[in-house]
Design a protein with these regions (language model features):
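Sec-dependent bacterial lipoprotein signal peptides
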Residues: 1-15
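Generic N-terminal helix/loop capping motif
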Residues: 11-14, 50, 54-57, 69, ...
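Membrane-proximal, proline-rich intrinsically disordered regions
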Residues: 17-67
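Intrinsically disordered, low-complexity regions of eukaryotic proteins
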Residues: 21, 67, 71-72, 79, ...
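Conserved, well-structured interaction surfaces
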Residues: 41, 49, 80-156
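Secretory-pathway/luminal and periplasmic proteins that interact with or process carbohydrate-rich
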Residues: 52-58, 72-73, 148-158
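Short N-terminal amphipathic alpha-helices
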Residues: 55-64, 74, 83-88
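Acidic helix-start/capping segments at beta-turn-to-alpha-helix junctions
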Residues: 64-71, 134-137
Length: 158
């Protein structure tokens, strides 16, 4: 009897196993994406788009021109942003300052690194994506990444 029970349990266990992988409907996996020249262009545009986010733009202004004599704080409202800007204006930046974070620039750097890593593979798959296209995309991503590193080093040093 034990022999029959173990055979039945083993057959049920084998039938219940499924070889398919469940993929999310709202996301694209790398294996399905990096196939065409247009998809590389989408990722290059995405890197530029992430550079234009409000977080990045606000920090570039605050880390750049705001610290010069050309811009000055005139608002006396007492909110978190004004307090953070007052700290920067007084060159007394605390670790809790909302502008003392660098994650948004590392998001841009990550997008550039992904393009630099995956774009060469597309040349082998899509003949319309030439070496000239790749070199153009590569140089843009290297320049954008270097700009982000420039701002990070200028403001946070090593």
């Amino acid at each position: 009897m034990k022999k029959y029970i173990s055979i039945i349990l083993a057959s049920i266990a084998m039938v219940s196993c499924v070889d398919t992988v469940l993929l999310p409907d709202d996301k694209t996996v790398d294996e399905d994406f990096w196939k065409t020249k247009d998809e590389v262009a989408q990722m290059v545009n995405g890197a530029y788009h992430s550079m234009l986010s409000a977080d990045v733009i606000n920090r570039l202004i605050v880390w750049g021109d705001f610290r010069s004599d050309e811009l000055k704080m005139v608002s006396i409202d007492a909110n978190a942003t004004v307090n953070a800007l007052t700290e920067i204006d007084a060159v007394n930046i605390q670790t809790t300052n909302t502008f003392a974070t660098w994650g948004c620039l590392y998001k841009v750097i990550n997008n550039c690194n992904i393009v630099l890593d995956k774009a060469p593979e597309v040349m082998e798959i899509d003949p319309s994506y030439t070496e000239g296209d790749y070199l153009t995309d590569r140089s843009q991503m290297l320049a954008l990444r270097a700009l982000c590193y420039f701002y990070l080093v200028r403001n946070f040093r090593d």
